[in-house]
Amino acid sequence: MSFVAYEELIKEGDTAILSLGHGAMVAVRVQRGAQTQTRHGVLRHSVDLIGRPFGSKVTCGRGGWVYVLHPTPELWTLNLPHRTQILYSTDIALLTMMLELRPGSVVCESGTGSGSVSHAIIRTIAPTGHLHTVEFHQQRAERAREEFQEHRVGRWVTVLNQDVCRSGFGVSHVADAVFLDIPSPWEAVGHAWDALKVEGGRFCSFSPCIEQVQRTCQALAACGFSELSTLEVLPQVYNVRTVSLPVPDLGARPGPDAAPFRSGTPMKETVGHTGYLTFATKTPG
């Protein structure tokens, strides 16, 4: 099992996502002899998981069933153990596009946190790229390093435990893109400039408050970055249904009493503010 490449059969040591129905999911580490309790009954790893294909429908102890899904960065984001606040797939998709990430890209990131963005970046830049991720908190850095090895993506990532605002990313002039998710990104802008390639690259920072964005933009402009822009992603879900309205009688011949048509109306409850994504470009020179 790898978050980068699909594998058909479940093996010991794999991470599997159990879909329990109605949107409920849980991530489990598959171990021989282990058991997982679900609302549908017990799931025995040796009998019910190991050797089965990913995507299998497995019957639990009480007669209920679950689907065993292959892990992806998107599913991991929804099921990971939270060590910090995380970014979700909507923001991750935008920053991946705006940073122009592709296989072979070299990326510098801070902070690692729970690894939500890290897994998505690794999947995008593999098999020839590399991620340099910096985490200030020692225990979070150690746990992230362990997870990358468990998920078999360790070859594409280097984890450093240091303060990026003081010590930088540990590399110079190698990165195609830099991503910051830290409380004071403006203090790391200079290190981001040094980490990016001499021929240029892309920068992104995530901040929940507009005051953080203002200070970051000032630092970016002072450092020489150009093409500054700040975006906020607010998805709007629409409810589409068929409705019928009465048709007025406008002539001598009788017509239909009502006519159906498709109507789309926005849902009353939508996802609110998560944060601002600020982008900039380091140009050659």
UniProtKB/Swiss-Prot annotation:
<feature type="binding site">
    <location>
        <position position="181"/>
    </location>
    <ligand>
        <name>S-adenosyl-L-methionine</name>
    </ligand>
</feature>
<dbReference type="GO" id="GO:0006397">
    <property type="term" value="P:mRNA processing"/>
</dbReference>
<feature type="region of interest" description="Substrate">
    <location>
        <begin position="110"/>
        <end position="117"/>
    </location>
</feature>
<keyword id="KW-0489">Methyltransferase</keyword>
<keyword id="KW-0539">Nucleus</keyword>
<keyword id="KW-0007">Acetylation</keyword>
<dbReference type="InterPro" id="IPR014816">
    <property type="entry name" value="tRNA_MeTrfase_Gcd14"/>
</dbReference>
<dbReference type="Pfam" id="PF08704">
    <property type="entry name" value="GCD14"/>
</dbReference>
<dbReference type="InterPro" id="IPR029063">
    <property type="entry name" value="SAM-dependent_MTases_sf"/>
</dbReference>
<dbReference type="GO" id="GO:0061953">
    <property type="term" value="F:mRNA (adenine-N1-)-methyltransferase activity"/>
</dbReference>
<feature type="region of interest" description="Substrate">
    <location>
        <begin position="85"/>
        <end position="89"/>
    </location>
</feature>
<dbReference type="GO" id="GO:0031515">
    <property type="term" value="C:tRNA (m1A) methyltransferase complex"/>
</dbReference>
<feature type="region of interest" description="Substrate">
    <location>
        <begin position="180"/>
        <end position="183"/>
    </location>
</feature>
<keyword id="KW-0808">Transferase</keyword>
<feature type="region of interest" description="Substrate">
    <location>
        <begin position="64"/>
        <end position="65"/>
    </location>
</feature>
<feature type="region of interest" description="Substrate">
    <location>
        <begin position="205"/>
        <end position="212"/>
    </location>
</feature>
<dbReference type="InterPro" id="IPR049470">
    <property type="entry name" value="TRM61_C"/>
</dbReference>
<feature type="binding site">
    <location>
        <position position="87"/>
    </location>
    <ligand>
        <name>S-adenosyl-L-methionine</name>
    </ligand>
</feature>
<keyword id="KW-0949">S-adenosyl-L-methionine</keyword>
<dbReference type="GO" id="GO:0005634">
    <property type="term" value="C:nucleus"/>
</dbReference>
<comment type="similarity">
    <text>Belongs to the class I-like SAM-binding methyltransferase superfamily. TRM61 family.</text>
</comment>
<feature type="binding site">
    <location>
        <begin position="114"/>
        <end position="116"/>
    </location>
    <ligand>
        <name>S-adenosyl-L-methionine</name>
    </ligand>
</feature>
<comment type="function">
    <text>Catalytic subunit of tRNA (adenine-N(1)-)-methyltransferase, which catalyzes the formation of N(1)-methyladenine at position 58 (m1A58) in initiator methionyl-tRNA. Catalytic subunit of mRNA N(1)-methyltransferase complex, which mediates methylation of adenosine residues at the N(1) position of a small subset of mRNAs: N(1) methylation takes place in tRNA T-loop-like structures of mRNAs and is only present at low stoichiometries.</text>
</comment>
<protein>
    <recommendedName>
        <fullName>tRNA (adenine(58)-N(1))-methyltransferase catalytic subunit TRMT61A</fullName>
        <ecNumber>2.1.1.220</ecNumber>
        <ecNumber>2.1.1.-</ecNumber>
    </recommendedName>
</protein>
<dbReference type="GO" id="GO:0030488">
    <property type="term" value="P:tRNA methylation"/>
</dbReference>
<feature type="modified residue" description="N-acetylserine">
    <location>
        <position position="2"/>
    </location>
</feature>
<feature type="region of interest" description="Substrate">
    <location>
        <begin position="20"/>
        <end position="22"/>
    </location>
</feature>
<feature type="binding site">
    <location>
        <position position="140"/>
    </location>
    <ligand>
        <name>S-adenosyl-L-methionine</name>
    </ligand>
</feature>
<keyword id="KW-0819">tRNA processing</keyword>
<feature type="binding site">
    <location>
        <position position="135"/>
    </location>
    <ligand>
        <name>S-adenosyl-L-methionine</name>
    </ligand>
</feature>
<feature type="region of interest" description="Substrate">
    <location>
        <begin position="35"/>
        <end position="42"/>
    </location>
</feature>
<feature type="binding site">
    <location>
        <begin position="163"/>
        <end position="164"/>
    </location>
    <ligand>
        <name>S-adenosyl-L-methionine</name>
    </ligand>
</feature>
<comment type="subunit">
    <text>Heterotetramer; composed of two copies of TRMT6 and two copies of TRMT61A.</text>
</comment>
<dbReference type="GO" id="GO:0160107">
    <property type="term" value="F:tRNA (adenine(58)-N1)-methyltransferase activity"/>
</dbReference>
<feature type="binding site">
    <location>
        <position position="274"/>
    </location>
    <ligand>
        <name>substrate</name>
    </ligand>
</feature>
